[in-house]
């Protein structure tokens, strides 16, 4: 922790923000520091940590101070962490929250997930080393040369040597396991290509395959599920997660919506999506939050809430006038219909059928007879006959 220096949190000249994540707690080695969880920012030059409550409390560490990083999986009651191993602090270091530390590493604990994406972006920055290619303000530079009177260099070299030996041993042990995984990935690639060809054939469908074959192929594709579902572990628990989830929902729901007349209840969507996601189940709250972003992201779907509170997902091209006209035509042909009868005729859920009839009633095209036998809708002759 003695490598951190106080900072304003503002980006320096030629410094670019890469990614940020809320709910990150810092450990000095294995010890939890006094600060509450805050926001961790990764730039091209620094790791910056800012207190979520007191924004004036902000500290940073140059990426040039990092030796290497490693992941630490989550456990029972423990969050996933990124372990950051550091060079010794420079003698001319600017003031920071800690004057000295016995540890040569820190841990970043991700309370609100997002560690997978953050680790990936941090690894990229450590590989590209962009801070060396761009002019860096003097305040960001750290003297990594040997300091007079310091004898810790030998200890650091020894630790690095042991870590390197341990890494080689680990690589040797897991190489055989990855051989099987590589074979599986090759097969997975073939399966993806096969699924794409099947999907294209279904889409074109110019008499090459029968209706029964189409249904069977679609069931195969559905059972295969989503290849790479959006998760909190990848994108965190904030707006970024819900935005990515909304984009994925738009991709997997457009075809089912077109088959169902352009509208589905949120309950149907929830079941369909979770079936496709397999083990990565989605909570109702996350589904609703993602659906609320569909229209703002200019995606082909939108969330609609009826007066009764029923939520549905519909295509942007889905027109209310056409829906009401279809309901009026069907009721006029039969003379009168209940929600159950209308649902059976239209091939939709009773919930959506009732909402469609209520909407037609609200617009004055239908009227109701609410009796002990149930709710029945009739064409509104008061509007059509004088």
UniProtKB/Swiss-Prot annotation:
<feature type="coiled-coil region">
    <location>
        <begin position="160"/>
        <end position="185"/>
    </location>
</feature>
<dbReference type="GO" id="GO:0043130">
    <property type="term" value="F:ubiquitin binding"/>
</dbReference>
<keyword id="KW-0653">Protein transport</keyword>
<dbReference type="InterPro" id="IPR037855">
    <property type="entry name" value="Vps36"/>
</dbReference>
<comment type="similarity">
    <text>Belongs to the VPS36 family.</text>
</comment>
<dbReference type="GO" id="GO:0005768">
    <property type="term" value="C:endosome"/>
</dbReference>
<dbReference type="GO" id="GO:0032266">
    <property type="term" value="F:phosphatidylinositol-3-phosphate binding"/>
</dbReference>
<dbReference type="GO" id="GO:0000814">
    <property type="term" value="C:ESCRT II complex"/>
</dbReference>
<dbReference type="Pfam" id="PF11605">
    <property type="entry name" value="Vps36_ESCRT-II"/>
</dbReference>
<protein>
    <recommendedName>
        <fullName>Vacuolar protein-sorting-associated protein 36</fullName>
    </recommendedName>
</protein>
<dbReference type="InterPro" id="IPR036388">
    <property type="entry name" value="WH-like_DNA-bd_sf"/>
</dbReference>
<keyword id="KW-0539">Nucleus</keyword>
<feature type="domain" description="GLUE C-terminal">
    <location>
        <begin position="105"/>
        <end position="138"/>
    </location>
</feature>
<dbReference type="GO" id="GO:0031902">
    <property type="term" value="C:late endosome membrane"/>
</dbReference>
<dbReference type="Pfam" id="PF04157">
    <property type="entry name" value="EAP30"/>
</dbReference>
<keyword id="KW-0967">Endosome</keyword>
<keyword id="KW-0175">Coiled coil</keyword>
<keyword id="KW-0804">Transcription</keyword>
<keyword id="KW-0813">Transport</keyword>
<feature type="domain" description="GLUE N-terminal">
    <location>
        <begin position="1"/>
        <end position="88"/>
    </location>
</feature>
<keyword id="KW-0805">Transcription regulation</keyword>
<dbReference type="GO" id="GO:0043328">
    <property type="term" value="P:protein transport to vacuole involved in ubiquitin-dependent protein catabolic process via the multivesicular body sorting pathway"/>
</dbReference>
<comment type="function">
    <text>Component of the ESCRT-II complex (endosomal sorting complex required for transport II), which is required for multivesicular body (MVB) formation and sorting of endosomal cargo proteins into MVBs. The MVB pathway mediates delivery of transmembrane proteins into the lumen of the lysosome for degradation. The ESCRT-II complex is probably involved in the recruitment of the ESCRT-III complex. Its ability to bind ubiquitin probably plays a role in endosomal sorting of ubiquitinated cargo proteins by ESCRT complexes.</text>
</comment>
<keyword id="KW-0472">Membrane</keyword>
<dbReference type="GO" id="GO:0005634">
    <property type="term" value="C:nucleus"/>
</dbReference>
<comment type="subunit">
    <text>Component of a complex at least composed of ELL, SNF8/EAP30, VPS25/EAP20 and VPS36/EAP45. Component of the endosomal sorting complex required for transport II (ESCRT-II), composed of SNF8, VPS36 and two copies of VPS25. Interacts with VPS25, SNF8, TSG101 and CHMP6. Interacts (via GLUE domain) with ubiquitin. Interacts with RILPL1 (via the C-terminal domain); which recruits ESCRT-II to the endosome membranes. Interacts with ECPAS.</text>
</comment>
<keyword id="KW-0963">Cytoplasm</keyword>
<keyword id="KW-0446">Lipid-binding</keyword>
<dbReference type="InterPro" id="IPR011993">
    <property type="entry name" value="PH-like_dom_sf"/>
</dbReference>
<dbReference type="InterPro" id="IPR040608">
    <property type="entry name" value="Snf8/Vps36"/>
</dbReference>
<dbReference type="InterPro" id="IPR036390">
    <property type="entry name" value="WH_DNA-bd_sf"/>
</dbReference>
<dbReference type="InterPro" id="IPR021648">
    <property type="entry name" value="GLUE_dom"/>
</dbReference>
């Amino acid at each position: 922790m003695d490598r951190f220096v106080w900072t304003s949190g503002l980006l320096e000249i030629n410094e670019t923000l890469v990614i940020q994540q809320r709910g990150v707690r810092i450990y000095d080695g294995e010890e939890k520091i006094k600060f509450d969880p805050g926001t961790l920012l990764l730039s091209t030059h620094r790791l910056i940590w800012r207190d979520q409550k007191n924004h004036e409390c902000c500290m940073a560490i140059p990426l040039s101070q990092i030796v290497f990083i490693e992941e630490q999986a989550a456990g029972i009651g423990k969050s996933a962490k990124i372990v950051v191993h550091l060079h010794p602090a420079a003698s001319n270091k600017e003031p920071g929250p800690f004057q000295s530390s016995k540890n040569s590493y820190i841990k970043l604990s991700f309370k609100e997930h997002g560690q997978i994406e953050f680790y990936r972006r941090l690894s990229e920055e450590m590989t590209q080393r962009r801070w060396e290619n761009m002019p860096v303000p003097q305040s960001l530079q750290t003297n990594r040369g040997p300091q007079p009177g310091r004898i810790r260099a030998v200890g650091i070299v020894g630790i690095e040597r042991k870590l390197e030996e341990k890494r080689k041993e680990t690589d040797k042990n897991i190489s055989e396991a990855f051989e099987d995984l590589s074979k599986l990935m090759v097969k997975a690639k073939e399966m993806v290509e096969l699924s794409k060809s099947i999907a294209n054939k279904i889409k074109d469908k110019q008499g090459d395959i029968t209706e029964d074959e189409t249904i069977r192929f679609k069931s195969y594709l559905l059972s295969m599920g989503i290849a790479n579902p959006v998760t909190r572990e990848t994108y965190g628990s904030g707006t970024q997660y819900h935005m990515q989830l909304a984009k994925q929902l738009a991709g997997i729901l457009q075809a089912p919506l077109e088959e169902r007349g352009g509208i589905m209840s949120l309950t149907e969507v929830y079941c369909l999506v979770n079936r496709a996601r397999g083990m990565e189940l989605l909570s109702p709250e996350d589904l609703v939050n993602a659906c609320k972003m569909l229209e703002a992201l200019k995606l082909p779907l939108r969330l609609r809430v009826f007066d009764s509170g029923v939520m549905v997902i519909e295509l942007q091209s889905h027109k209310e006038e056409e829906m009401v006209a279809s309901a009026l035509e069907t009721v006029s042909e039969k003379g009168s219909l209940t929600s159950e009868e209308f649902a059976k005729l239209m091939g939709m859920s009773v919930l959506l059928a009732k909402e469609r009839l209520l909407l037609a009633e609200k617009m004055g095209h239908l009227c109701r007879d609410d009796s002990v036998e149930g709710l029945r809708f009739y064409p509104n002759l008061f509007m059509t006959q004088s």
